[in-house]
Amino acid sequence: MKKSLQILLIEDDPDDVELFLDALKDNNVLHTIQVVMQGDEVIPHLEQSSVRPEVILLDLNLPKIHGKEILKILKSGDAFRDIPVVILTTSSARTDVEYCMNAGAEKFITKPTNTEGFDQLVTVITEIAMSKQKGG
């Protein structure tokens, strides 16, 4: 049985936001998805929100503050360190992958370009969130 997830999507491209939202819609599961579109709004959003995400989807190329800096902030303090972060970006540069994984990202995924890719992404996100809930 699939579980509904609390997801924070940090993405500045409205078209990608729409694709992610469509992919995260499931006939049997209604995920709660919050969207933040600028890097400088992420931490204030998390601090003020009454809903704690079970997984964060983070683009690297964001306005105001780069995704790598956001990841560093999230993983350096106690408040949000335990929330799994999945990097979703067009970059596949080895330096970006290494930096993000060393900084505490759960997974680094190049943005899908088709519906099948987004469906696989939803499966990965669900597995990561469920693993963390079980103490993984």
Segments and roles (model prediction):
Residues S4-L24, I56:
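Conserved acidic segment of CheY-like receiver
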Residues V35-V55, D119:
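Acidic, metal-coordinating helix/loop segments flanking the phosphotransfer/catalytic sites
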Residues L58-D59, T89:
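Active-site residues of response regulator receiver
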Residues L62-I65, L74:
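Hydrophobic residue at a beta-alpha junction
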Residues D82-S92:
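A short, hydrophobic beta-strand element within the central beta-sheet of small alpha/beta folds
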Residues T113-I125:
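C-terminal output helix
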